Amino acid sequence: VQPKQNILHLPVYQPGKPISEVKRELGLTDVIKLASNENPFGCSPKAKEAIVSLLDQVSIYPDGGAVDLTHAVAEHYGVKPNQIIFGAGSDEVILMIARAFLTPNDETISAFPTFPQYKHNAEIEGATFIEVPVDENGKHDLKAMLAKVNERTKIVWICNPNNPTGTMLSEREIVSFIESVPNHVMVVLDEAYAEYTVNEEYPDSISLLNKYKNIVVLRTFSKIYGLASLRIGFGIGHPDVVRSINQVREPFNTTSFAQKAGLAALQDHEFIRTCREANAAGIRQVTAELDKLGLPYFEAHGNFIMIDVKRPGQAVFQGLLQRGIIVRHDPGWGYPTKIRVTVGSEEQNRKFLEALEQVLSEVAVS
């Protein structure tokens, strides 16, 4: 049995190493994972209570339309319920957008490096994927991306803040780009890390939906809300666009646990505020030490920092791993001397910085 020709070259997604695997492989008892941009403070206590309340309903199918959560999200963001589509993580919404709109005759554009699932899902549909390198500061080169738009372009993907670089586009930049692309081009604004941003120039993208019908905004409960293992995220767009995405959505694609926990997490504003402030403090803590070490880094607007360690990134990754610190280095990013580290708690950040200084003394500068 032969698979589709256009998937033969596709890589299998490689997540950050799990803690249990590192403990087992290296015989360690104390391991800190700063590889997958998870919330170091977990999730809202209210979300935990919501999960426990459903334990006796495991045998019951979830609400296929996630009605309660849909209405809560609609109220939270000031949109209509028919503008919202849920997925098992926002990455499933990416999959559904590609499935609903891309054909082998289409082209689709993103920055490079960025979240790999845009390319992955576009190529499954046979579309031509065009990657435009970020600039020297790790930001989307919107002018160069716009130059690639033509009559075959169907979707432009913009990750903001961008993963893995952590950089941010302002509302002025986003609006200018949207107004420059033809109406037949969908602009997907992936804002998985939006709740972490404290920069006043960060776009209020959801309000832009009132003016632009060709944009879709993606959000997730996996990051600041701390529900990564439950897999739930959503897209907000024009009702006609959302209707098309819904047509390719699998039934019961989000669990009762995810829906109920998401509802509780959405309403715990104090938890989100605390996490946002702690993350901002963590960025200051880490970057202050990086400045002392003379290590460059991109501006961080999410909950992670991309650092130029001035040494082979894989060697630094391995050195940190031996000390029980899991970070991320991906040769596919095109940055051989850079690592990406999640901002942890104050103690986790301190242990990372101590380990990093030790590793830097052992690995030769490139």
Give the ranges of each region predicted by the language model.
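Conserved PLP-binding catalytic core of the aspartate aminotransferase-like
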Residues: A280, E289-R323
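N-terminal "arm"/small-domain region of PLP-dependent enzymes with the aminotransferase-like
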Residues: V1-I60
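Short acidic capping loops at alpha-helix termini that bridge into adjacent secondary structure
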Residues: D30, K80-I84, P104-E107, R152, ...
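Phosphate-binding glycine-rich loop
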Residues: S59-E107, E125
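PLP-dependent enzyme catalytic core of the Aspartate aminotransferase-like
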Residues: G319-R323, R328, G332-S366
